[in-house]
Amino acid sequence: MLKEFEIEPLLKDKAPHQTKAVVAMSGGVDSSVAAALLHNLGYKVVGVTLQLYGTDGNANARKGACCAGQDIYDAKRVAESVGFPHYLLNYEEIFKKEVIEDFASTYMRGETPIPCVRCNQTVKFRDLLQVTKNLGADVLVTGHYVRRLEKNGEVKLCRSIDKSKDQSYFLFATTQEQLKLLRFPLGGFYKSDIRKLAKYFSLQISEKQDSQDICFVSESYSKTIAKLAPQSVQKGKIVDVNGKVLGEHSGIVNFTVGQRKGLGIAHNEPLYVIKINTENNEVIVGPINVLMQKKILIKELNWLEQPKEGMEVTVKLRSSHVGSLATIHSTDEKNKACVILNDDYFGISPGQACVAYKDEQVIGGGWICS
């Protein structure tokens, strides 16, 4: 059966039995299959799981999460059944600082965060790559649905074959230096293939559901942020774009740009959240046309391939976005760029990522400022 699931060699100049691969194991089906597949192909696999949260027991029984409680047990059990070493590293304090606190502070700036990108950018890639080097391994392998293509010494990050599972949007902040050591063996497969492989390898987690939503949010977003930043639930005013007071809100944590439902105010036309003014603790609302825009300013740029001035690309403005045609332009501000969409787009949210593609290839991107 394994002949149906061929992958590119992890290293072109080393045979599998000479190649040591650290596999980041979350306890889910994808990373477990990646580890089992490589082990069966003869690679020297070392499984590593990061304990990111939940040592207080709060997240241990939560379904659809990862990297805590049951998931750690599942990763260890897979390693034992397949027959490769597995290590558990406690990264809870680092995760709290780099991801959870950033999540809360982003909301407090009136933005909508994507903690999964921050986690990949810091804990999972930056720190795990250092662990990989410390263990004397050749590569770091993850179960992400994304493809890494290498030609003439140049590495490209590309969309997964399975577009319904593609995770390239969440990996836009990966650097060229990191890509040299990273490998994504599942990018050429469909999720259904991975389920088949899990059963073929007799993995106990073959039917385990995929992780969903934000792993450390055990309640609602608002309750989680309220615990991290109590000031986010202070009452304030809801005003229109001209500053007229329309009502009162119960905390900015309950609102996000583009939101229509749950505003708690009556008006003669539908109103949407236009902006969250954290300085004045105000939620600014207006008609839908105010939310339609073509021009986007992005910051903290990461280009896997430096775009030329006016380069035509397709951009994704949220993970579920199918993509919009656009051009990329330089600005006078350091580490910022301007993206001009061909057509108006509704509800562009500061704090989200703007990721540029050229066909299947990830060019790079940045965080939306405005």
From Swiss-Prot:
Residues annotated as catalytic: 119 (nucleophile), 215 (cysteine persulfide intermediate)
A molecular function GO annotation: ATP binding
Residues bound to ATP: 24-31, 50, 143
UniProt KW Phosphoprotein keyword: no
Segment forming the signal sequence: none
UniProt-listed InterPro entries: MnmA-like, MnmA-like_C, MnmA-like_central, MnmA-like_central_sf, Rossmann-like_a/b/a_fold
Alphabetized HAMAP family for the sequence: tRNA_thiouridyl_MnmA (MF_00144)
Name of the protein in its database record: tRNA-specific 2-thiouridylase MnmA
Gene: mnmA
